[in-house]
């Protein structure tokens, strides 16, 4: 189970196997970043749900608390690292680590609250819905953010956040779309990211309280 988990955790990516993702996004062209964030990162969580859990349910159940803790670390660590970035593309990459942490948390709550262990069926349903919805939302939001970063990079030929002062005056429509995309990435109420993250917490709180 541990070897399978490490393999899928690298793909998610889960802390401390996350270090490859920001470097890969920075070097990749926009189209590859969109595919990586929109589709490929989800395969890690999908593999944990579709391969690890059915094959080794007892082991996954016993380690569900550790998986939830790693997901929570992803949420906090990804957000803190994103705040420290000056490269706009690397900021979006670290936000992906944060977003996938919510999916990990929701998935762990599904396993811990599974009915086959006499757990909370409502929490399991909320966690599963939250994890799947979060993966979908991350795919759309992060792909949109990487496209927006690619657009401004083609114009400015750099990604230094400090060099984008006054951009709203030159590109008002672009700035408005950016604001909507980043608000969605933040998970503010009214955007899809809030719903999925809230469902992950609803699934996790009754199980890991």
Roles of regions detected by a PLM:
Residues 1-209:
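Hydrophobic transmembrane alpha-helices and their helix-loop junctions in integral membrane proteins
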